[in-house]
Swiss-Prot record:
<comment type="function">
    <text>Probable regulator of exocrine pancreas development.</text>
</comment>
<dbReference type="Pfam" id="PF15060">
    <property type="entry name" value="PPDFL"/>
</dbReference>
<protein>
    <recommendedName>
        <fullName>Pancreatic progenitor cell differentiation and proliferation factor</fullName>
    </recommendedName>
</protein>
<keyword id="KW-0217">Developmental protein</keyword>
<comment type="similarity">
    <text>Belongs to the PPDPF family.</text>
</comment>
<dbReference type="GO" id="GO:0030154">
    <property type="term" value="P:cell differentiation"/>
</dbReference>
<dbReference type="InterPro" id="IPR026754">
    <property type="entry name" value="PPDPF"/>
</dbReference>
<keyword id="KW-0221">Differentiation</keyword>
Length: 113
């Protein structure tokens, strides 16, 4: 079971203000920050989560990585895909192009002599 650190390294996403705790530093994998006890306002133009770590999107739901795109196959016709955010993973695009070349004689990739 993981222990919760008492140095305040957990992030509260629902608070508008973050309260810094009375410790002098944090010795965690989340980075080292000095805490002095004052209330720090959250700027309205900035996201409330900490986007500085690759794993932040797993907790805060803001994924922009192309391989994290949700792709689902249409049940009506095999080979038709629905993509949720407009990005196509490279492997899926390559497989789709290869299938089109096999089925379409006009897009034959062999060089003409």
């Amino acid at each position: 079971m993981a222990a919760i650190p008492s140095s305040g390294s957990l992030v509260a996403t629902h608070d508008y203000y973050r309260r810094r705790l009375g410790s002098t530093s944090s010795n965690s994998s989340c980075g080292s920050v000095d805490y002095s006890g004052e209330v720090i306002p959250h700027h309205p133009g900035l996201p409330k989560s900490d986007p500085g770590h690759w794993w932040a999107s797993f907790f805060f739901g803001k994924s922009t990585h192309p391989s994290m795109t949700t792709v689902s196959e249409s049940p009506e016709s095999s080979g038709t895909f629905s993509i949720s955010n407009g990005l196509i993973p490279c492997r899926l695009a390559q497989e789709s192009l290869q299938k089109q070349k096999v089925g379409d004689p006009k897009s034959d990739s062999s060089p003409s002599a």
